[in-house]
Amino acid sequence: MKTLTILRHAKSGWDVQVERDFDRPINKRGARGADLIGQWLKRQKLPVDRIIASPAVRVTETLDIFQPAADLDTIEPHWDRRIYLASAATLIDVIRDTGRDAGHLLISGHNPGLEDLILMLVPESDDDELRGEVEEKLPTSALARLEIDIDDWHDLDVNMARFAAFIRPRDLDPTLAPAMDHD
């Protein structure tokens, strides 16, 4: 069995003027969310043995905060440009390229691709509350952990996963609940 942890980048600063969307940094609220989610992962003692991530600034800054908080700072992320603004289908290809040796993979990137990836991997069910929450919104710094009954990431396909966990920054600190979280 494999586990896939999906981490959306932290809240970014729309007020910062940058030439390219790729260069947009996270803001203070985003930094707090990334730290809280990292601490939560550490408390849960959920292992991660490989990280693949978008090289966009808001993802690298998220991981700069999340990894030490989660006690994962010894893992060097593999930066993959295909993850930047990728579709769910592209994200599945990226994950399949991981091979068999990583048992607990973490992918960090962007919406709508990550949200669509979760909804593609976890089958629809009337009684799956976590899937319903993701259908509503995968907010910034949210983390979903999926369990998948495969031995090799190359075998990953749709409707194969089940939720092990889903956590948002506002679940850990209600002051981080947004009126409208558009990024």
Please identify what each model-predicted range represents:
Residues 44-46, 98-103:
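Glycine-rich phosphate-binding loop signature in dinucleotide/nucleotide-binding domains
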Residues 169-183:
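Glycine-rich phosphate/pyrophosphate-binding loop and the adjoining helix
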